[in-house]
Amino acid sequence: MLVKRFQPFLVHLFLWNCLILFALISPIMPSLIILISVPFALIDLWLCFTLGLMLRLPRQRQNTEIRENWISEEKVIDGYPVRWLRTSIDEDKPLAILIHGWNSRPINMEGRSKIFLDSAYNVLLFEMRAHGGNLPVDHWAAMHVCHDFEEVLKIYSNNGWLDNGFIVHGHSMGGFIAQRGLRPELETSKNLKGLVLESPVTSYSLINNATCKVLRIPASLHPWMMKRLLRHYNSMNKDRYTVTDVEFLESPQWGLPDAPTLLIQAKHDSTLGQGHWKHLVDVHSRHDSNFEYHIVEELKHSQERSNEGRDELISDWMEKESLIF
């Protein structure tokens, strides 16, 4: 699959080699042709190589032993074993689904789940593919995980787990997945009662720009690189995962759930910066939505399994929205 990731680089490398070979056998000033071509070739090959680098893979981890009081389950979706942890299901209680962030694992959301357990919820910790010690993948994309999430929501609905309503808490990339998987037009979203977004990703363009900056790609080329990356991505994926344009990958086109939404944002977010939460606030300011947000001084982007300030804000919001049972 590395060949697919770096296919543009390999194709362009072949074409530039062909051009140089042609120049060498050409009777018309071969040295001049090569001299002019080399700078353009180096720039073009570097930009092609970065396309493969931009298709990042999660860090591979070891499986960990399932802790007491958690039940591990999985369902094969599109050839991949999608997993989750859950508590014993009380059919009279609502459900809280928590989605971890990039390079994390579901059990890292256990601390965040306590507030929902204390509020009489069944709790389920959803695992993104290729995380938490699960099987690695050749190519990872948010659209793959969104499809997984939408499919398992159908399973949960068929099991009756969503009948009493459900809340979703998504952290970072987990928040991005939640926004897509809880679109109002989906049948499984009809019993959604609330959404908590903790320092969420809200725009893939912003992710792309940050990656381009790390790769020392000039800012003027960022939009062009994003469009080029989309073409490369679409060539690697099935039609169900196709991304039509850049705007599709950010709120509100990506998804704007029709439920009370609470944004809790780390004030000093060293991972995502300020652009993502500001974009989401702007989107909700232009829509008639039940939206509340808090910028929390004492909250970091990661390593916050327990945070009293965050939990207090969630508890107050749940009480205000009549979500405590």
Predicted regions and their residues:
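The serine-hydrolase catalytic nucleophile loop
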Residues: W102-I115, G275
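Conserved alpha/beta-hydrolase
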Residues: F116-L135
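Gly/Ala-rich beta-loop-alpha elbow adjacent to hydrolase catalytic centers
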Residues: H169-A178
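Hydrolase active-site cap/lid region
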Residues: E187-Y241
